[in-house]
Regions:
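Carbohydrate-recognition beta-sandwich/jelly-roll modules
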Residues: 1-46
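Aromatic- and carboxylate-enriched substrate-binding clefts and catalytic-loop regions
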Residues: 44-173
Length: 173
C-alpha cells in the first residue's frame, strides 16, 4: 500500500501438467484420460498442459510423435478447449538432442565450441544449443511458434532449458 501498488484482482493461473503424472510417457489416450480426470478438479479457464513427450525428439518441434499422437495436436487442443481449459504445451526451443532430425539435417544451426556442437546440458540425454544468431535458426523458431500458437491453437507455452540461448566459455566461437 505504501508503494501505491494495487492488490491483484484477477485469479492466478492454475492447472495441470502431464509431466508430474506421466513424464514422457504420454499418448493421445493418456492425455484424454487425464483431461477426463481434470474436468472434475479444475475450474473453467484453468490450464491443461501437455508436457515433454509429444515431440519425436527434443528439437523436432514442427511435428508430433506419430506413434503417440497419430492425429497430431490440433485435435487435442480442441478437446482441451471443449473442456473449458486453456491449452498449454512444453517446448525447449533453443536446444536439440543429437538423435533429432534437426541435429542431423542442420549441423550449421548448432552453436559450436572448439569446432564441435556445444553440449550445453542434459535432461534424459545431452542437449545441444542452437545458434540464435543464425538467421535460419530464427526463422525456424518463428515457424515453431507460429505452428504451436496459430496452427495448433495452444494458448500458452512452457519454455524450458532456455540456458541454451546463453552460451558461455568457448561456445562463443
Amino acid at each position: 500500500q505504501a508503494m501505491g501498488i494495487k492488490p491483484r484482482t484477477e485469479k492466478k493461473l492454475a492447472g495441470y501438467s502431464s509431466w508430474y503424472n506421466r513424464y514422457q510417457d504420454i499418448t493421445e489416450d493418456t492425455i484424454r484420460e487425464d483431461l477426463t480426470g481434470c474436468r472434475s478438479l479444475l475450474c473453467p479457464g484453468d490450464l491443461f498442459q501437455i508436457d515433454d513427450g509429444w515431440e519425436p525428439k527434443v528439437g523436432d518441434w514442427l511435428e508430433t510423435d506419430a506413434q503417440k499422437f497419430p492425429h497430431g495436436l490440433k485435435g487435442m487442443v480442441q478437446e482441451i478447449h471443449a473442456s473449458g481449459f486453456q491449452a498449454g504445451l512444453w517446448l525447449a526451443p533453443f536446444v536439440c538432442e543429437k538423435d533429432s532430425a534437426l541435429f542431423r539435417q542442420h549441423p550449421d544451426w548448432l552453436l559450436k565450441a572448439d569446432s564441435k556442437p556445444w553440449c550445453c546440458g542434459s535432461n534424459w540425454s545431452s542437449f545441444y544449443a542452437l545458434d540464435i544468431d543464425n538467421p535460419a535458426v530464427l526463422d525456424y523458431l518463428r515457424r515453431v511458434f507460429d505452428r504451436v500458437l496459430n496452427d495448433w491453437g495452444f494458448d500458452l507455452v512452457k519454455l524450458d532449458f532456455l540456458y541454451g540461448a546463453a552460451p558461455f566459455g568457448s561456445a562463443h566461437e
